[in-house]
Regions:
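Short amphipathic alpha-helical segments
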Residues: 30-32, 91-94, 139
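Residues that form or flank phosphate/diphosphate-binding pockets in enzymes
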Residues: 28, 89, 116
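A solvent-exposed beta-alpha-beta segment
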Residues: 2-82
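Structural signal for interior beta-strand "rungs" in well-ordered beta-sheet cores
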Residues: 107-157
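Glycine/small-residue-rich loop that forms an oxyanion/phosphate-binding "nest" at active or ligand-binding sites
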Residues: 80-108
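Short, hinge-like loop/turn segments at secondary-structure boundaries
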Residues: 59-62, 96-97, 124-126
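Short glycine-rich, flexible loops that bind phosphorylated cofactors or substrates
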Residues: 69, 86-87, 134
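Residue-level detector of anion-binding/catalytic polar loops
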Residues: 59, 104, 150
Length: 157
């Protein structure tokens, strides 16, 4: 008798990720995610853009109302690309929306950035190109470290 090997069907695909926000910052985030080579961008969620538009070739899927459908399809990862310069509450609201819908926001570190092994990055941290996070630094949830920024040793951000 020939046995056929079967594998379990997992409830989600850890390589699929959505980008929440389609503005200017999203272009830097999309490029960072692509060159990282870990995730496949499923699309953009943006409450102020039309479904079918695209940002750097990634399709706009709709607004926050699409999150339950994406979750049902097995997408669990998200990156917050809403800037909110001068008003962190805008970014924080997006993190709450994503968490309430069951999504996880992993840290994203551009391959040209360097994070020392003793540094700690919390959920949703974005470390963009040419940045450096030094020894024993702590970078708090959702922090955006823009291009070419240095976070020195023992700093708490």
């Amino acid at each position: 008798m020939d046995e056929k090997t079967t594998y379990p069907k997992f409830a989600y695909d850890a390589t699929k990720i959505i980008v929440y926000g389609g503005g200017g910052l999203s272009k830097m985030i999309i490029e960072s995610v692509r060159v990282l080579g870990v995730y496949q961008i499923v699309g953009i969620i943006d409450d102020n853009m039309q479904e079918g538009e695209d940002v750097l070739g990634s399709p706009v899927l709709g607004g926050a109302e699409e999150l339950p459908k994406l979750f049902e399809e097995g997408v669990r990862m998200a990156v917050n690309s809403v800037g909110g310069i001068g008003n962190y509450k805008v970014r924080l609201k997006v993190f709450h929306t994503l968490a309430d819908a069951g999504f996880v926001c992993p840290p994203i570190v551009h391959p040209t950035a360097h994070v020392d092994p003793s540094a700690r990055l919390e959920a949703g941290v974005l470390v963009l190109a040419q940045s450096y996070v030094s020894g024993n630094a702590r970078v708090g949830m959702g922090t955006l470290i823009n291009n070419s920024v240095v976070i020195s040793h023992d700093c708490v951000v």
